Amino acid sequence: YGVVAQMFAFLIPAPLLLFLTGGRNYTFARTESRYLVLACGLILLTLITFSLVYAALDIKPSQLAYLDMKDILKNKGAFLFLTAIIVPAYEEWIFRGLLFGILVTESTRRREAVFATIFVSLLFTAVHIEGAHSLSALPPIFAMSIVLHLMTWKSGSLWPSFCAHSLQNLLAASTMLAAAAKSAAR
């Protein structure tokens, strides 16, 4: 229940943040399709880069996260929907929509936006520590967050970051399901 508790911990102040910002944040506004393609491509490039670095250094992510997943195997569709759609939409709205939107406005200087990106990316990474089960998973999460922020800032919309985040979570969830199925078969 750790991840669910974290989500609710962020959900409680979210309406207050929305009210206090007067709607001054990033939303799921229309955006150019090139930003969607670019965001997904950058996330895939980030994942491939970290996979190659980890393979070269013989770093293996912890399998602990996959061993407790027998219940998830009972309802794969709900797990994939929650992981690939609901969680990314929620996290994008909270981290890039509200928090980043509060810190970065149209008049924000580039340097301030970089600091805001790093700060919110550190928060995003911190929220994912419990689910990572390995310190080696944190650098890719941080890098992914930086990429998602840049896409949101450049496009002015949450759609590119949501699509890229959904793709990343779908790949991770599929890997988890495959590992859980393999572990359950033993």
Q: Model-found features: residue ranges?
A:
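Hydrophobic alpha-helical membrane segments
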Residues: A9, T46, A143-V147
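Alpha-helical hydrophobic membrane-insertion segments
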Residues: F8-P15, V37, L52, V114-F115, ...
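Alpha-helical transmembrane segments in multi-pass membrane proteins
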Residues: Y1-T21
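Transmembrane helix-loop-helix hairpins at the membrane interface
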Residues: K76-R186
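Juxtamembrane helix-loop-helix connectors linking adjacent transmembrane helices
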Residues: Y1-G2, T21-V87, T105, A180-R186
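Structural signal for the C-terminal ends of transmembrane alpha-helices
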Residues: P15-N25, M151-S155
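Helical transmembrane-bundle signal
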Residues: F10, L47-I48, F124, N169
